[in-house]
Regions:
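TRNA-recognition modules of translation machinery and tRNA-sensing kinases, especially anticodon-binding
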Residues: 1-182
Length: 182
């Protein structure tokens, strides 16, 4: 059982089968496969969530999980990786914003927003805020590290889960995620 698998955002096929809501459970598989080595992996997968369908969210999406485990990995390393992703993907004009959040598998947890293609003029994609959330992230929770075989007194790490559709929307100035699936 994964701590974020709750009834309100999950598609249950039957009482024993659930569709994947995110790629985070892949962290444990990666840790158990690569222990005791440091890890830097990307884990892609298709995900499903019981969500309202809007210009910015769909019930199905592809997610990329990033996981780094090593000695002295810090939150600033995660923020640097996300900033570098934004610069490489969009150029130096794209801004990122970090907000505190909560996820049961990271501590502390953050959400990463990127400045919208509307250039703060307001649009339906960003709900006229000028920002679009693109990733949930944080430092890997000590319990998750332990479950993966890593001693949290020695090892630290960060993880992020990023859908591929929202960055594509920003890259190509598309104003509705539903164009990908409908």
């Amino acid at each position: 059982y994964h701590p974020s698998r709750d009834m309100w955002d999950t598609f249950w096929v039957n009482d024993k089968v659930v569709l994947r809501t995110h790629t985070s459970p892949g962290q444990i598989w990666a840790m158990r496969e690569y222990f005791p080595e440091p890890i830097r992996v990307i884990l892609p997968g298709k995900c499903y969530r019981y969500e309202q369908i809007t210009p910015r969210s769909e019930h199905q999406f592809y997610q990329v999980e990033g996981l780094t485990i090593g000695k002295n990995i810090r939150l600033t390393d995660l923020i640097g990786v996300m900033g570098e992703f934004a610069r490489k993907m969009y150029g130096i004009e794209r801004k990122i914003r970090i907000r505190g959040s909560y996820f049961p598998f990271t501590e502390p947890s953050i959400e990463i927003d990127m400045s919208c293609s509307c250039e703060n003029k307001g649009c339906r994609l960003c709900k006229s805020t000028g920002w679009l959330e693109v990733a949930g992230a944080g430092m890997v929770h000590p319990v998750v590290l332990s479950n993966g075989g890593y001693d949290p007194e020695e090892w630290t790490g960060f993880a992020f889960g990023m859908g591929v559709e929202r960055p594509a929307l920003l890259k190509h100035n598309i104003d509705d995620i539903r164009y990908f699936y409908n």
